[in-house]
Amino acid sequence: MTLWINGDWITGQGASRVKRNPVSGEVLWQGNDADAAQVEQACRAARAAFPRWARLSLAERQVVVERFAGLLERNKGELTAIIARETGKPRWEAATEVTAMINKIAISIKAYHVRTGEQRSEMPDGAASLRHCPHGVLAVFGPYNFPGHLPNGHIVPALLAGNTIIFKPSELTPWSGEAVMRLWQQAGLPPGVLNLVQGGRETGQALSALEDLDGLLFTGSANTGYQLHRQLSGQPEKILALEMGGNNPLIIDEVADIDAAVHLTIQSAFVTAGQRCTCARRLLLKSGAQGDAFLARLVAVSQRLTPGNWDDEPQPFIGGLISEQAAQQVVTAWQQLEAMGGRTLLAPRLLQSETSLLTPGIIEMTGVAGVPDEEVFGPLLRVWRYDSFEEAILMANNTRFGLSCGLVSPEREKFDQLLLEARAGIVNWNKPLTGAASTAPFGGIGASGNHRPSAWYAADYCAWPMASLESDSLTLPATLNPGLDFSDEVVR
């Protein structure tokens, strides 16, 4: 029984599904997808639960959410192992994900008050008030790269605001999704407030097609995000928040400490085996001897990165990709770039057949025409050389995406110029592209999102504002507008 609908664990009536560890092949989870009727059932449960949940005070909802945070803390080791085994991440990285989930609770509570709390301004004849109201029933689509943390970033603020939810995890991480839902159950969520439907494309299409849905919150690929946007077109009454991918540039200008810059680049391009939406995909490197030395050192250090299983000791920097198919797609992308004229500096290698263990790849594309503006979701870094900083900014902006961008340089003036001209939602200076603060908004422009950033701003798309003019009594104004006559004289 792997679906959680209206407080009950039930068996899916759709296609059967098996999840294996992407490195060892061990069977981790087996179950069935939700069919269209069960998706409808989950929606009815969420709709029925909404009025009572929304009418609870914020303090009452907060008690449940904070109880969930305590359960995350007490079950940190077990959840870390589940996420690591299912995604292929090393144990250390899965542990940081669970920590981020825990920290998200307090941050979301604070964001609720700052972004969507109540405000009141006194006026001579009353008051002006601002309140925020929940949308109703929201669908949350989760990604596989952070199957706990990223859905959590939608679910927690949505629940705090008073919404009820239907959650569909990625079909590649059903076990992590189920494990987190069981903790929410232990936290005491009333039946129907949060519902879990497992499944792939068919389940997702049934969920996004629900008429009685008030909104959809999505983190995932640009292709799927565009499909959802088209599916919900003509329905402005539904809130749609899309956080998609990026073809993110990292500009390496002047470098004082080459090893520090190489470390930052590896953290930007290859952490999580390149499976973060903010990962550097394009390295823009200044021409010259210093750039040559940096590139040689980057290749030398990257060659030493050996991916391993989630529980290997000593712990590896990177694990496997989410699947052997995903790893093969990266290799295919590299082969296509090489065929276009790219110069391979470090070839990505699948270490074993029937696993997703893939070493990083680096390929120089300077002077190659027609390079696709696509996100390769894995450890493959493309390199371009530039002569002037103005050229670097033009190259950085030469993408339909706009998620993250970074600069390595000692010059504040160049960062200030980048801040003015960059088209990206995250612009970092001497920090990895993959670094983002939960106390700031997270999202991009262009093909990276639809101007509804998550993290600190998630509260914004989880509630709508209600403005009020209020007075506890009604009296006739001392001064009336022209043409109004309230005298006692009878008009004949």
Curated annotation (Swiss-Prot):
Protein EC: 1.2.1.71
Where does this protein hold NAD(+)? G220, S221, A222, N223, T224, G225
Keyword field contains Oxidoreductase? yes
Its catalytic activity? N-succinyl-L-glutamate 5-semialdehyde + NAD(+) + H2O = N-succinyl-L-glutamate + NADH + 2 H(+)
Q: Which GO terms describe its biological process?
A: arginine catabolic process to glutamate; arginine catabolic process to succinate
A Pfam family that the UniProt record links to this protein? Aldedh
List the molecular function annotations (GO) for this entry. aldehyde dehydrogenase [NAD(P)+] activity; succinylglutamate-semialdehyde dehydrogenase activity
The superkingdom listed in its UniProt entry is: Bacteria
Provide the active-site residues from the annotation: E243, C277
Q: In which pathway does it act?
A: Amino-acid degradation; L-arginine degradation via AST pathway; L-glutamate and succinate from L-arginine: step 4/5
Question: Is Oxidoreductase there in the keyword field?
Answer: yes
InterPro entries xrefs: Ald_DH/histidinol_DH, Ald_DH_C, Ald_DH_CS_CYS, Ald_DH_CS_GLU, Ald_DH_N, Aldehyde_DH_dom, SuccinylGlu_semiald_DH_AstD
Sorted alphabetically, the keyword list is: Arginine metabolism, NAD, Oxidoreductase
What function does the entry list? Catalyzes the NAD-dependent reduction of succinylglutamate semialdehyde into succinylglutamate.
PANTHER family on file = ALDEHYDE DEHYDROGENASE-RELATED
Family in the record:
Belongs to the aldehyde dehydrogenase family. AstD subfamily.
Tell me what this protein is called: N-succinylglutamate 5-semialdehyde dehydrogenase
Q: Which organism is it from?
A: Escherichia coli (strain SE11)
